[in-house]
Structures are given as structure tokens and as C-alpha cells.
């Protein structure tokens, strides 16, 4: 008798234009710094910087550097990551797979491609 094995964790590269047409993801994570995120970001994207994600490799730091909402995410639901030019988001995607997420979308070209495609962005107004 052959038992079905769980699906192999996958990272899928997807252009911004295709991503906005795809089914919803449980979370859309912008891995840039807080400053970069505040300047402009995709709608519904939540900021969780790459350094914080990478620090989660250290078991003792894991629960200190990642927010509570992160630990409540279902590991089998799609998750997406974006950065400025798609140099940081692939590293974040790999780490998310190591943390047990099975479906991770990496937005190719990052926020630069997002803007070039004419997709909407938001800006956070930070009080000085």
C-alpha cells in the first residue's frame, strides 16, 4: 500500500501582473526595511523585514523576532513575498520554506516591477 506523501514545499516566481490575478494568499509580506515600506508598498502587504526573517534561523531568537501573527499562519496556505528588486525576497522565500511553509510566491522584479506595471501602491504617513 502506497501512502500519499505531503506535497514538496515549493517557491514559485510570479510577475506582479500575474500575482494580482491569482487566488488570494494568507499573507503578503514585504521584506524591505520599515523605511522603504513606509515610502510605498503594495496594498495588503505587511512589513516583516528580511533581517528579522533570517534571524529566525536561530531557535532561541525565533519567537522574539517574529510577530505573533506570523506564528498563527497556516503552513499549508499560500504566502507571498516582495522586496524592491527581487534580490531579498528569494532569500526570504527560502527561509519561509525552511520554517515549514509549503507554498511561497516570490514576486519577480519586486516593487519596481509592481510600479512599472501600474499596479496600485500605498504610502504610510509617518509623524516626525
Residue ranges and their predicted role:
Residues 1-27, 34-78, 87-128:
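Rhodanese-like catalytic fold shared by cysteine-dependent sulfurtransferases
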Residues 82:
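Short, surface-exposed ligand- or partner-binding patches at beta-edge/loop junctions that are enriched
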Amino acid at each position: 500500500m502506497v501512502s500519499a506523501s505531503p506535497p514538496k514545499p515549493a517557491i514559485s516566481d510570479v510577475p506582479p501582473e500575474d500575482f494580482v490575478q491569482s487566488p488570494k494568499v494568507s499573507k503578503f509580506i514585504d521584506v524591505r526595511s520599515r523605511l522603504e515600506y513606509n515610502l510605498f508598498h503594495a496594498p495588503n502587504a505587511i512589513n516583516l523585514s528580511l533581517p528579522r526573517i533570517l534571524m529566525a534561523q536561530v531557535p532561541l531568537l525565533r519567537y522574539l523576532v517574529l510577530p505573533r501573527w506570523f506564528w498563527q499562519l497556516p503552513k499549508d496556505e499560500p504566502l507571498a513575498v516582495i522586496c524592491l528588486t527581487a534580490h531579498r525576497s528569494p532569500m526570504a522565500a527560502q527561509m519561509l520554506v525552511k520554517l515549514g511553509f509549503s507554498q511561497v510566491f516570490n514576486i519577480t522584479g519586486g516593487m519596481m516591477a509592481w510600479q512599472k506595471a501600474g499596479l496600485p501602491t500605498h504610502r504610510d504617513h509617518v509623524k516626525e
